[in-house]
Amino acid sequence: MAFTWIRHHILGLEDWQPEEYQTLLQTASSFREVLSRRTKKVPALQGQVVTNLFFEPSTRTRSSFELAAKRLSADVLNFAPGSSSLTKGETILDTALTYVAMGTDIFVIRHQQSGVPDLIAGEMDRLESGVSILNAGDGQHEHPSQGLLDLFTICCLLDEENPRLELLEGKKIAIVGDILHSRVARSNIWSLTTAGAEVHLSAPPTLLPKYFGELCDRLFLHWDLEPALEKADFVMTLRLQKERMTANLLPSLREYHQSFGITRPRLQSCQPGVKVLHPGPVNRGVEISSDLMDDPDFSLISQQVTSGVAVRMALLYLIGNLRSDQ
């Protein structure tokens, strides 16, 4: 029986079912083919309005969502908080309602506080506006589109023609870095463990609290790097989010790199053909060495950026198409 997409908002991946991941992978694969054409545009969301509400700085995610919406022929509005009525005391909800009155169909929302996309989604549902919310990263909660594009990147490497969830069954994936503050880590934990992968988290104790081990099955914690990397199929390294650190959680960036930085020699204990991912932006020479980051034999960072457009097209299409059917 064919799976029917019914999810109106994309707020996080914690409750996603395997069928939803598979539908997303198949849809993103179709749009990846579209993006390989000379004419990279389709009329799937023609006449719909996508509004990017980004309350904290972003280059990759905002640009990727904007390009994805435009490739689907949607009209795109970009919100700039510094020049908005928020500086005059307007609330976030009132700002959103202003854009609803302009005809917004889908909000893409990033905010430094966890839960803001959920709050706006709840208000949209209460008002029966029909507007969908897509979380582009909220505080330390989740970053679902990043988790999905990482999943898609890995699956495409394993089978470019037919990326599917089952390809990750039994794979070992190490996630190294600032786990404590990372919404990317949380979304990847949900997606990768649902796919059947073993996820090994590694960081200094100050950046990897013990409670992470209670999130789900197939999740392992390491306060040393070596056991996390041993026989790993993929290594995902995360940026140290210094802007979110309110205490001295690390002696120095140099000492962090010496203990947890991903370098070519450290990958020798991984599986042959190991690949490295990073959600960006990258602190070269801190989370990962420059030579490794730029080596196409190891690094999937460029592929992650490319995959991001196809995955975000798929997300916008799935919720936008659901809206058009209502």
Curated annotation (Swiss-Prot):
Keywords: Pyrimidine biosynthesis, Transferase
Family recorded in the similarity comment: Belongs to the aspartate/ornithine carbamoyltransferase superfamily. ATCase family.
Annotated function: Catalyzes the condensation of carbamoyl phosphate and aspartate to form carbamoyl aspartate and inorganic phosphate, the committed step in the de novo pyrimidine nucleotide biosynthesis pathway.
Subunit field text: Heterododecamer (2C3:3R2) of six catalytic PyrB chains organized as two trimers (C3), and six regulatory PyrI chains organized as three dimers (R2).
Pfam families, sorted: OTCace, OTCace_N
A single MF term (Gene Ontology): aspartate carbamoyltransferase activity
UniProt KW Transferase keyword: yes
GO terms (BP aspect): 'de novo' pyrimidine nucleobase biosynthetic process; 'de novo' UMP biosynthetic process; amino acid metabolic process
Gene Ontology annotations for the cellular component aspect, listed alphabetically: cytosol
Coiled coil ranges: none
Protein name, per record: Aspartate carbamoyltransferase catalytic subunit
Nuclease recorded as keyword: no
Pathway(s): Pyrimidine metabolism; UMP biosynthesis via de novo pathway; (S)-dihydroorotate from bicarbonate: step 2/3
Residues that bind L-aspartate: K88, R183, R239
Binding-site residues, carbamoyl phosphate: R60, T61, R110, H143, Q146, G280, P281
Catalyzed chemical reaction(s): carbamoyl phosphate + L-aspartate = N-carbamoyl-L-aspartate + phosphate + H(+)
Top EC class, one word: transferase
Enzyme Commission numbers on file: 2.1.3.2
InterPro entries: Asp/Orn_carbamoyltranf_P-bd (IPR006132), Asp/Orn_carbamoylTrfase (IPR006130), Asp/Orn_carbamoylTrfase_sf (IPR036901), Asp_carbamoyltransf (IPR002082), Asp_carbamoyltransf_Asp/Orn-bd (IPR006131)
